Amino acid sequence: MDKLALQFENGLKDKMLRAKKECKYNPTRFNQMLAQYGGVETAKRLISNGITTGATSDGYTTLYLCGRLDLTMEHSVCKPEYRDLFTSEEICYCNNLMGVK
């Protein structure tokens, strides 16, 4: 795993811990996916599912209801420093969820 992908994954793990503490949300399936696929592939799989089905992930919905979209995986994908890890379609999908025009 390259340095940027590792940085992305570690950021997701930090957000996961904050979500558990601040929103009482334990993203068990997301944690399992991180362990199995790594951060970038997990994000790509969840984004692909969202694009295909038109439905957001359970984690996104839970954090939205908690008022903490800053803790979502989609928020991380939108960060300029991680743009090289994702396609323009994946970034556009996440920007739309974040309300970025």
Residue ranges and their predicted role:
Residues 16-68:
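Amphipathic alpha-helical packing elements
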Residues 10-13, 37, 55-56, 88-101:
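Compositionally biased terminal segments of proteins
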Residues 9, 15, 31, 42-43, ...:
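Functionally constrained cores in energy, signaling, and assembly domains
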Residues 1-22:
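Charged, compositionally biased N-terminal leader segments and the immediate start
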Residues 3, 21-24, 30, 73, ...:
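Short, well-ordered helical secondary-structure segments
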Residues 64-101:
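Amphipathic alpha-helical binding modules
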